[in-house]
Amino acid sequence: MKIDGYTRMAAVVANPIKHSLSPFIHNLAFDLTDENGVYLAWEVESKKLAAIVENVRNLDMYGLNISMPYKGEIIKFMDELSPAAELIGAVNTVVNHSGKIIGHNTDGIGFFNSLKKYDFKIENKQMLVLGGGGAAIALIAQAALSGAKKIVVAARKSASYDPLNEKLAKLSAKTGVEIFLTDLSGADRLQKELNQTDLLVNATSVGMDGASFPLEKSLLLPDRLLVVDAIYKVRETPFLRWAKEQGAQTENGLGMLIGQAAESFYLWTGKEMPVDKITLEMEREV
């Protein structure tokens, strides 16, 4: 890596963040594309966010990636939001557009871009998502923006269930796409929806331990189904093994991780990230 007077910076901002794989991904991408840039990890307190964003402008940085817990809080410091970021209510990518600071969310578009190798497009298709956290909302919003026919969200009954239902109703009203919530423990209803589903996604952390399972194992999967687990630190979760045993195409969360990074990289540099080469390196790293 060459560092000189022309080198531009990007960084990921969160707390904690020193464990992040983002510097590995982006610095490798800078090298492979001959882009004179460097990517760092900044672990900062909430009170420093305004100054960090101002540094993007003052230091002519490419921009930032934003991770938890700041994806929502960073919004108030943006000059403008992309349609996806506005709909999701979270920013994971900050772009310096000639001094104008624009907040984007690349989680959803990165996820669906990672499925192109299966010739899969969400337009006019049905998706079933397990979980209703931040990752799930990003995928749901992007699916709606991309013309999904129907989106079913399955979550366990808890204190967050009714607020999630309200959030999904608002997303549905804003996009005109049918989005509804169902109880994850309702096996009969889930089976009915699965029979019509084209894409099944686990957007929970269940399975991160390599043993736990997010839904009833008695459920039967349709032949044409594509099944994705957002978890990437476990190469093949029990959920993916179960789906593969039923004949489904399966994908772990590494594609989503690299896909969202690739979209950020493009927004900053105008260059395509060499995803295939970086995926090979990441498979050795993870």
UniProtKB/Swiss-Prot annotation:
Give the annotated active site: K71 (proton acceptor)
Query: Which is a GO BP term held by this UniProt record?
Result: chorismate biosynthetic process
Q: Which Pfam families does this entry report, sorted A to Z?
A: SDH_C, Shikimate_dh_N
Q: Which residues bind NADP(+)?
A: G131, G132, G133, G134, A135, A230, G253
Q: What class of enzyme is it?
A: oxidoreductase
Q: What Gene3D superfamilies does UniProt report for this protein, alphabetically?
A: Leucine Dehydrogenase, chain A, domain 1, NAD(P)-binding Rossmann-like Domain
In which pathway is this protein known to take part? Metabolic intermediate biosynthesis; chorismate biosynthesis; chorismate from D-erythrose 4-phosphate and phosphoenolpyruvate: step 4/7
Q: Per UniProt, where does shikimate bind? A: S20, L21, S22, S67, N92, D107, Y232
Q: EC no.?
A: 1.1.1.25
Q: What reaction is this protein's catalytic activity?
A: shikimate + NADP(+) = 3-dehydroshikimate + NADPH + H(+)
- Which UniProt keywords are present, listed alphabetically? Amino-acid biosynthesis, Aromatic amino acid biosynthesis, NADP, Oxidoreductase
Q: Which GO terms describe its molecular function?
A: NADP binding; shikimate 3-dehydrogenase (NADP+) activity
Q: Which PANTHER family match?
A: BIFUNCTIONAL 3-DEHYDROQUINATE DEHYDRATASE_SHIKIMATE DEHYDROGENASE, CHLOROPLASTIC, SHIKIMATE DEHYDROGENASE
Function, as annotated? Involved in the biosynthesis of the chorismate, which leads to the biosynthesis of aromatic amino acids. Catalyzes the reversible NADPH linked reduction of 3-dehydroshikimate (DHSA) to yield shikimate (SA).
Question: Family assignment?
Answer: Belongs to the shikimate dehydrogenase family.
Quaternary structure? Homodimer.
Question: What protein name is recorded for this chain?
Answer: Shikimate dehydrogenase (NADP(+))
